[in-house]
C-alpha cells in the first residue's frame, strides 16, 4: 500500500496557486500549440514539467546568499565551492557555469579537441548509458554521434530491478570494438539515468565501465545532475554500503570518472547554476577555462553571481542529508505506488526524481511517431491543470544524418517532482486526476507537427491533434 513520508521541514513562505478553469485550460493549450513547454506558468496548477531549477531553497541557502562576494575575479564563494567539490568528489579543478548545458558546452568541445590533437576522433562518438536531450544535443552540435547503451532491463517497465540505469557492459565492449577506442571522445555515466526513468546506476557498474574505459584510454565524464539520489539508492540497495554515509558513497562514486558536469538546478537544490569539475588533468582544465571566458564568463564565476555560488555550496551540503533524501525518494515512490495500485503502468520501481508513466501500454493505439505520451500529457492537463513532460519519440527527435525519426524504446510521461515544493496532498491530487482519466485513454488520438524546430524540437515545437 502507498505510504506517505512526512516532510522533514516546516514551511516559512508560501506561493498562491490556482486551478485554471476548464475553458482557460483548453484555450491555453491550443494557444501553446498543444506543447506544454509553451504554456505560461499562470495557466498551470501543479507543475511537473521538470525538477530543474524548480526547487525550494532553504532558510540557510537564502542566508548564504547574503554573504555573496560579487567580485568579478577571485570571489570568495568560488573558493568555498572549490573546497566543497574537493570534499565531495576529490577533484582538483572546478569551473562554475550558469547551468548544466553551460557546463557541457565548456567541456565537450574541449574533449573533442583534446582527442583530435592526438590525431584521433576522425569519426567522433560519445557513449552513455543514456544521454539526456540537452546532453545529446551538445554531442551532436559538435559533430559527434551520441550512442545510448542502457541495460535491457530498463525497457521492461513492469519487472523490478535495482539497477535499471546500468550500462549494458556487453554493448559497451561491442561499441568500443565497432567504432574504435580512438574515435570515442568520452563515456558519459548519467546518474541517475533520467531517460530510463530516473533509475540508479550501481557502484559495481560504474567501476566496471571505468575500468574498461581506462583499458582503452577513454575519458569518463559523470553527468551529475542527480548524484545524491543515485548515492541514496546505492546505500539503500547495495549491502556493501549499508553502513556508509551518503558522502562516503559519493566519494566512492567519483573514483570512477575523470570529470563531471552538473546541473546544480537539481540535487544541489538551486534555481540556477552548474559546474564542471576535473579530477587531475591540468591540460583539459586549462583548455576548459579558456573556453569558459567567452562562453560563460570569467573563470571564477562562470555566469553566476557570488550569491548563487554561496547557495550552491550550502545546497551541496543539504542535498547529501540522508533524512532529506529518504523523504525525497519516498514522496516520488508514494505517487508511483498510488498509480500502480490503480493499474496505471509505470517504470517500476520508481526512480529518484519522477514517476514515469508507460504510455506505450496506456495508449497502445497511438504509434510512436504520433507521440503517445504527449497525447496523455495534454489529456492530464485538460483534466486537472497538471503539466507533465514527454520522454520518448517527441524528445528524441530525428537522426541528424538521415532526418528520420529516432526510435524510442519507451514512450514515457514524466511526472517530475520539484524538491521541497509540493506536499503529499498534491501527490494525491495528481494521482486522482490521472486515475480519473482511465476510461478516456482508449479514445485518445495522436499529434502531428505544425512547426518542427531542427534542434531540441520539443521545447518550441507546435503540434495539432490528428483528426
Curated annotation (Swiss-Prot):
InterPro entries: ArAA_b-elim_lyase/Thr_aldolase, Beta-eliminating_lyase, PyrdxlP-dep_Trfase, PyrdxlP-dep_Trfase_major, PyrdxlP-dep_Trfase_small, TNase, Tryptophanase_CS. Gene3D superfamilies: Aspartate Aminotransferase, domain 1 (3.90.1150.10), Type I PLP-dependent aspartate aminotransferase-like (Major domain) (3.40.640.10). Keywords: Lyase, Pyridoxal phosphate, Tryptophan catabolism. Pfam families: Beta_elim_lyase (PF01212). GO terms for molecular function: tryptophanase activity. It is an enzyme of class 4 (lyase). Homotetramer. Pathway: Amino-acid degradation; L-tryptophan degradation via pyruvate pathway; indole and pyruvate from L-tryptophan: step 1/1. This is Tryptophanase. Its cofactor is pyridoxal 5'-phosphate. Belongs to the beta-eliminating lyase family. Its EC number is 4.1.99.1. PROSITE patterns: BETA_ELIM_LYASE. It comes from the Bacteria.
